[in-house]
Amino acid sequence: LDQLKQMPDSTFNFDDVNLEYFKDVYVMLGHNYELFNGFSLMTGLAMHWRYTAYRNSEVEGRVRTRYNGFAPRIRVSWTPKMHYYMNGNRKVNIGSRCPTFVVDYEHGLNVLNNSGSYQRLEMSAEQVINIRKIHSLAYHVGGGFFTKQKEMYFVDFVDFANRNLPQGWNDDIGGTFQMLDGRWYNSSRHYIRGNMTYETPFLLLYPVSKLLSFIQKERVYGGVLFMPHLNPYLEFGYGIGTHLFDFGV
């Protein structure tokens, strides 16, 4: 880690360093319950079993060959003024004009062999704003950090992951970073990020809309990420949505 911190941002390249030292087996158990309208509480347990990917005398001389993790987890999600309807005895949420706020906390405990302690905290807010019924602006902002790490040198964020998409967005392209190397997601103890998508049926293709009637929506994407060696990282894109698929560049 000290060697990585000393590398200038302009010269840092993951392909120049070998970080594939460990394999990870991960299990997450959880239960989610809505305490009252719009306020959900998830409690769970996260467990990791990490071991060296291959025999390396340089690595084995500095760190252990096995690291285990045992961490109780709690996640709170609150959407003020949530609208809903009842389908029999089942409550169905249909959305709100207010943002959704999320706090996710995990506390690693030193209870297993070769385990260590740590704390992870992530916070975020996201919303889809409808504009005159046919346009929409969706945004997601958030940040997180690891702290009090003792004999545990891995960072595994939950909200900041290339597999994680915001809830309720109309496509699977916005809300995340499409071009970011996946190794960045677990390369820093802290991050701040923001993503937005503007969606409208009329934008660049409006003059030829009659010829391209199968296109339902046009979208403009933007994203910014702050973390060590990426200050900042920016992404911009354009996409279309049809009955069958979404496409973006």
For the regions a protein language model found, what residue spans apply to each?
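Short alpha-helix boundary/capping motifs
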Residues: 58-59, 153-154, 224-225
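C-terminal outer-membrane beta-barrel translocator/porin domains of Gram-negative envelope proteins
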Residues: 2-19, 89-94, 98-206
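Outer-membrane beta-barrel channels and translocator barrels
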Residues: 34-38, 81-83, 130-134, 201-205, ...
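Extended interaction regions within the primary functional domain
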Residues: 3-8, 15, 56-59, 139-141, ...
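Transmembrane beta-strand segments of outer-membrane beta-barrel domains in Gram-negative
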Residues: 2-133, 219-221
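Feature targets compositionally biased, intrinsically disordered low-complexity regions
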Residues: 29, 43, 68, 141, ...
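Outer-membrane beta-barrel transmembrane domain signature
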Residues: 136, 197, 201-209, 213-242
